[in-house]
Swiss-Prot record:
Primary location group: mitochondrion
The name this protein goes by in its record: Large ribosomal subunit protein mL45
Annotated Pfam families: Tim44
Cited InterPro entries: mtLSU_mL45, NTF2-like_dom_sf, Tim44-like_dom
Keyword Transit peptide: yes
Native organism: Caenorhabditis elegans
Keyword entries, A-Z: Mitochondrion, Ribonucleoprotein, Ribosomal protein, Transit peptide
């Protein structure tokens, strides 16, 4: 009987009782991000979701009737606005603030952004002028393949796409070379005269950033003597910037073989490059660009391409030619150079040995 009573007391089910657990949550903020950001409530029984997550932390601040905030006076702000950078640094040091340690000076890195030109050349490939020999079959096959692809892209991604734009339905490559030569000459004349208005008319923003430093602190002298070979179009490319935006930009690479004079001087009048008297035969691959997305787009000089087989450019002249009078004043007599420290010690040692003898 006693055993049955014990079994009934253990096995007999009783009514389920649910109790609410009220826990402090601010010790779980590091692990429970939803509770910390207020997405979930700390107290499930509370219907007020606007209660601050960490109530205990801000309880003392909410109990204060007033809060003292240090605000600078208007007169101090006016003085700071009139201070120079040196005076401002001294004032901050008086307050115990090191401006170069705790607050670094702001550095401005500004760059011009435009959508009527692209800062680069779309396709810098230029077919080689001298075709390879047939003995090297692999290289010859690759060369022929690249030439065929290049001609196909000139039509598919070049002239065909340009003629679809309004105002360029009658675009012809054969008549473009004469216009390219005129743009080339006008751009260099504007550069020689430092005329920014004319430069932006004949060159793009990408070319301006490269050409303007030559005349900003110096000068350029340019003269086109003659055109040795008729200019011809080498590559035609058309693309949109940004991609799939319809803002089409066209680039045409023209091979120009000319005889010209070019001289670059520094701000002191010293010759840096070239000569005003010497004529040179120059072969250049000049890139011209046009914002064909607009009807009134104009062709402008954009840059140059330097293939691998082309001759290296002339380096800058680091010396100046002396006149006959300056050469006569120069003394050609040999002079003994001052001795080095080790040589001086050896010489002093020898003199001491001779004195002892």
């Amino acid at each position: 009987m006693l055993g049955r009573a014990l079994v009934r007391s253990f096995v007999q089910p009783t009514a389920a009782i649910t109790t609410q657990l009220a826990g402090v949550h601010h010790h779980q903020e590091a692990t429970d991000m939803k509770r910390f950001t207020g997405v979930t409530r700390s107290n499930k029984a509370k219907a007020n979701r606007n209660t601050h997550v960490n109530e205990k932390l801000f309880r003392r601040m909410r109990g204060r009737k007033t809060l003292l905030i240090e605000l600078p006076e208007d007169s101090a702000r006016e003085k700071e606005a009139e201070m120079s950078p040196g005076e401002m640094r001294t004032e901050l040091l008086k307050r115990g603030i090191n401006p170069y340690k705790e607050a670094q000076p702001r550095v401005w890195n500004e760059a011009q952004v435009t959508f009527q030109s692209i800062y680069g050349i779309a396709d810098p490939y230029v077919p080689p002028e001298n075709p390879g020999s047939f003995t090297d079959v692999n290289n010859k096959f690759d060369e022929v393949k690249q030439r065929i692809q290049h001609k196909f892209y000139n039509w598919r991604m070049g002239t065909n796409r340009i003629r679809k734009k309004q105002g360029f339905e009658k675009f012809d490559i054969k008549t473009f070379c004469a216009k390219a030569e005129d743009i080339y000459v006008q751009a260099h004349r504007a550069l020689e005269q430092r005329d920014k208005t004319a430069m932006y008319k004949y060159i793009t923003e990408y070319a301006f950033a490269k050409m303007w430093p030559d005349v900003e602190n110096g000068s350029v002298r340019f003269e086109l003597i003659s055109v040795l070979e008729p200019s011809r179009v080498v590559a035609v490319r058309c693309f949109d910037n940004p991609p799939k935006s319809g803002n089409d930009i066209a680039q045409i690479t023209v091979r120009m073989h000319t005889r010209q004079k070019l001289a670059v001087y520094d701000r002191f009048g010293g010759l840096l490059l070239g000569s005003e008297d010497e004529e040179k035969d120059v072969v250049e691959y000049v890139v011209f660009e046009n914002h064909i997305a607009v009807v009134d787009g104009e062709w402008r000089l954009h840059g140059k391409i330097y293939p691998k087989w082309i001759d290296a450019k002339q380096g800058m002249v680091g010396t100046q030619m002396l006149s006959a009078e300056q050469v006569e004043k120069q003394h050609a007599e040999a002079k003994a150079l001052p001795l080095r420290t080790t040589e001086k010690l050896e010489e002093a040692k020898k003199e001491k040995e001779q004195q002892e003898i």
